[in-house]
């Protein structure tokens, strides 16, 4: 029987990984718009998965608010992705934001890895901002569902997009008000304040090609670290 010197066996190579985050409108979407955005989000997730090996670690980060957040959460879970849910408050407090859809929130939370920001209602905007920035710091591409003009103040979609652009996190911009192809925002210079669609940002087929190249580049880097729990991010939430 052949023998092997186990002292010469190195550690297994890390699995390739990719993380998709979300920021976007919380308003109610009509069925046609919701269907279109769900399709566009699914196309991005499928593009990522098709570009990486079958053993890749695929993660979606969503705070699970009504609207955009849940579109990504549902699409990711339907494809077998791991869902991470950074929450601005403890779930019992956060549920007050959407009294009509608490059951849908709980259903998603039960299938996610929840993380809680150490925030409270007395500093709600700071907590929303912290959750949004956590998503940006821990994703490889950020989906932004935004109409291009609404300003939500601190922690809103426009502010989180600016934060992502400054951090050079690619933004996959989907417009809920127009059936246009996605725009890929690649750098801070392509966004002004308030953010607006740059004329030179790739869209449609060109954006998808650049996305595939972006995903492929992750194969040459170390695996993504676990979510950053430093700073405002607190403990792992369980048992709800």
PLM-predicted stretches and their roles:
Residues 2-198, 203:
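Acidic/glycine-enriched connector segments
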Residues 218-240:
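Basic, amphipathic N-terminal segments
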